[in-house]
Amino acid sequence: MSSQSITIDLWTDIACPWCYIGETIFELSKSSFLSLHPSTTITTIIHSYMIDPSTKPEGEDYLSYNKRRWGSDSWTIQLKEIGKQIGCNFKNWKFWANTLKAHMLLQESKKFGKEDEIIFDLYRLSYEEGKNISNENVLNDLAKKYELKEWNNESNKMKVLEEDQIGKNKFDIHGVPMFIFKETGRKIEGAADPKKFVYEMELALKK
């Protein structure tokens, strides 16, 4: 008998604009898949990953960071065009965040099953509202929305660092978002075509 549940491990970083796009495509694909398989449950387990832990703790100016890393921000032109097609806007992208503390808040939200909502709020704050999600005041405001009081602690910090290292060392992840389907062990990296996500879900369901 085919399984009626699918579990996906997702490694992601809020400072990764392709993660915003890739996860939005995934959510759209998931809705499409569930319309065909309404009795199926899809569980996404979010894991913290930091692309550039050396980003200044307070975050960095968007353009300055791009110039330092890549010489310019010209690579974002295609990104923004793709994002626009699925409702991901980057109109107020002002900071390149150090995401350690944002991931700590995300870890706290996982204890209460609020991670799926809060991660998209973090993306919107960063890319659409021009907020610096390295800033504790910004994160505290978001924490209040979800009634998360004790997020800024050593336990959450250690969990972030642990998941980051597991992703990089155990699973050899060098790019995010990375979706790993537990039933098949198959992977999807990046902002893949919606049909690819649906195909992998179909394979997972047959296991």
Regions found by a protein language model. Name each.
Residues 24-126:
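Structural alpha/beta surface segment adjacent to cysteine/selenocysteine redox centers
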Residues 16-19:
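Short cysteine clusters
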